[in-house]
Amino acid sequence: NGEETEDKFYKVYEPLNVEKGFRFSYTPAGKKPQRYINGLSELKAAYHKMNSEEEKEWQRTHDDDKPYKEKKLPEAFICSGERDSLCCQSMGYHPLWFNSETYSLSAEEYREIMKYVEVLYNIPDIDETGRRKGTELALTYIDIHTVWLPDWLASYKDNRGHGRKDLRDWMAKKKKKKDFKNLMANALPARFWVEWLTKDGKKKYEIDTACLYNFLSLNGFH
């Protein structure tokens, strides 16, 4: 596919280390780029693999000279960390995650991701920081579909007495893939209008009421 081979690095966990700042580290030192999206390399590989297989099938079933047109993967999910990403992948989806919850996705990084997928979902934590960052991302890139986990999840406590807040916690209560698909079905973008071309080539716009309510809610109107 013509892309450069990336340097490999590993994240080492020491969850029982008494020093919180040393519970994980990266090795070899200096190999991890300053900005890095975990899962993006795997997403690209899945995209190229799918299109390679689709193109072979196209060539097998088409005798004309019409070239094969590359297709995007249906979706990918921004998750809030490794645990959530493993849960997402266990259901057959492509996870992406950042090195910290406060990471700001750049416009260039967003465009790069959207080369490979039709829809990008975000599954933020439902604590204060997660809601704030999830709202911020939704309003920055208005085509991202935000999967808000249900409020009832926070009524369950972890071993430190804190409310449950992430996808891994949710999957401890809802293990069926159809439950996750229901979450996906309720995920909305902040873009509240749709556009299409008429038969004579004119562009038309229409308000999507559900997305408009979502946009207003993201901006603090309830």
Model feature map: region roles:
Residues 1-116, 134:
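Phosphate-handling DNA/RNA-contact segment within nucleic-acid enzymes
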Residues 74, 85, 92-95, 119-121, ...:
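Conserved NTP-binding/hydrolysis core of motor NTPases
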Residues 76-78, 117-129, 148-151:
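Acidic beta-strand-to-loop metal/phosphate-binding motif
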Residues 99-104, 125-126, 151-153:
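Short, acidic/turn-prone active-site loops that include or flank metal/cofactor-
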Residues 104-112, 132, 156-167:
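Short, charged, surface-exposed secondary-structure boundary motifs
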Residues 132-143:
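Short, aromatic/basic amphipathic alpha-helical patches
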Residues 139, 155-197:
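Short, small/acidic-rich helices and loops at N termini and domain boundaries
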Residues 188-222:
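N-terminal nucleic-acid engagement/recognition segments and initiation subdomains in replication
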